[in-house]
């Protein structure tokens, strides 16, 4: 949740991946940071990422990509691998929410709190992150994000998009 590639300008900005992308580039790796909605369902984020993967493949001429996802980015990259396995060489999840989050469950259980948080996230925080990435078209939907992030949402996702990487 609330992921971004870079917010701000070079002189005054924040890199989500800190120095990882420049370090990989210095060592000869072609790297791209995706720009996807900071708050959305895994499938919506996955479709956004899939479009960018197709652009990277067209731009580089490489047949496959290696995807790295942090937090909600883990299930997001798994979605791409599930729907277009021919595009994916490898997946790496860092602190990924493959089995859901009890915090998401607790937030969803608190209707009043979720509604208030949704207003702030969907209309203030999410748009600020999207604008900060110079991509104000990225929409935010906290409820969809939390539902995907929840333990039940993760179980449904894992059944729909199975992987041998997760033990039963």
Language-model features: where?
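Short, flexible coil/linker elements and helix-boundary hinge sites characteristic
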Residues: 13, 136, 161-162
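Active-site catalytic motif of lipid deacylating hydrolases and related acyltransferases
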Residues: 1-65, 113-123
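Serine-dependent carboxylesterase/thioesterase catalytic core
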Residues: 47-155
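Glycine-rich, aromatic-lined ligand/substrate-binding cores of catalytic
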Residues: 151-168
């Amino acid at each position: 949740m609330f992921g971004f590639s870079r917010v701000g300008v070079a002189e005054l900005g924040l890199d989500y991946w800190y120095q990882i992308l420049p370090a990989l580039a210095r060592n000869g790796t072609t790297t791209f940071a995706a720009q996807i909605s900071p708050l959305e369902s895994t499938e919506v984020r996955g479709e956004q990422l899939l479009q960018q993967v197709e652009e990277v493949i067209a731009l580089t001429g490489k047949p496959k990509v290696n995807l790295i996802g942090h937090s909600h980015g883990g299930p997001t990259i798994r979605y791409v691998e599930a729907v277009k396995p021919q595009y994916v060489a490898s997946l790496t999840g860092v602190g990924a929410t493959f089995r859901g989050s009890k915090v998401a469950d607790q937030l969803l259980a608190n209707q009043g709190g979720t509604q208030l948080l949704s207003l702030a996230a969907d209309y203030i925080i999410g748009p600020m992150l999207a604008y900060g990435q110079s991509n104000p078209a990225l929409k935010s939907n906290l409820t969809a994000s939390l539902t995907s992030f929840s333990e039940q949402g993760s179980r449904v996702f894992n059944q729909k998009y199975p992987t041998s990487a997760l033990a039963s």
